[in-house]
Amino acid sequence: MSEAGKKQTEGETTISENRALSGVPVMEREVTALLEEISSCPETAAVAVGGSRATGKADKKSDYDIYVYVEMEIAKERRKSILEKYCGVMEIGNHYWESEDNCTLNNGVDIDIIYRKLQDFEGDVAAVVEQYRASNGYTTCMWHNLVTCRILYDRDGALEAMKKRFDVPYPEVLRAEIIRKNRALLSGVLPSYDAQIRKAASRRDLVSINHRTTEFLASYFDILFAMNRQTHPGEKRLVSLC
């Protein structure tokens, strides 16, 4: 066990112990050690693994999607001091989508560590599941991410409580809102994607055609998952999953 793991308070379950209990496929030893160090930071409330590593669909090219739920930000210097022990390539503090450290482990496997404020994330999921807020595509992705993640560390049980809160049947009002909003974007109103695609095609604007077609498909799959009362898994393997 790493030194960080030894610092766990008495009676507290470590990452290496908890991963077997939670059903997570066996992780590389260095990943386990890395996550034990992150979980030892006082700012860390919970750690979970998501994506194909959590659902059992990982292949040789699959990276690690790690979600660190914090009460306040862990200092970049502290994160770097942990990650440099296990990663040959590090990009600390990327903010292209969420707050992330994007790295490559010493064994060549990529690992994305996403940091989320626990309360903010819970509010975002509640806005969809309980307040029925539909988006232009990908509406239920965060909900899906929560209910399918595997918890590795949960200091006060807050993440498990959140999973239980949102482990509910697909709300019919939300389903209707997703279909209504995204169906209009496919066709039938002035800004609909089909009209924009035709206009771009008439101009032979290949970049615009590609962009509008991508948005069309985002709304199209959002409708399909809603119709089937399935949470949206993201942008990968959509044809086989819907």
Please describe what each predicted stretch is:
Residues 51-85, 100-116:
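Catalytic metal-binding acidic patch
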Residues 189-193, 197, 209, 216, ...:
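Amphipathic alpha-helices that form helix-helix packing interfaces
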Residues 14-23, 87-201:
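Conserved NTP/Mg2+-binding pocket subregion across the NTase superfamily
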Residues 2-48:
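Helical scaffold of the NTase/Pol beta-like nucleotidyltransferase catalytic core
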Residues 201-208:
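Short helix-adjacent coil turns
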Residues 211, 218-231:
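Short, charge-rich amphipathic alpha-helical segments embedded
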Residues 26, 185, 208-211, 215:
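Alpha-helical initiation/capping and key positions within long helical/coiled-coil segments
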Residues 229-242:
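Short, charged amphipathic alpha-helical segments flanked by flexible coils
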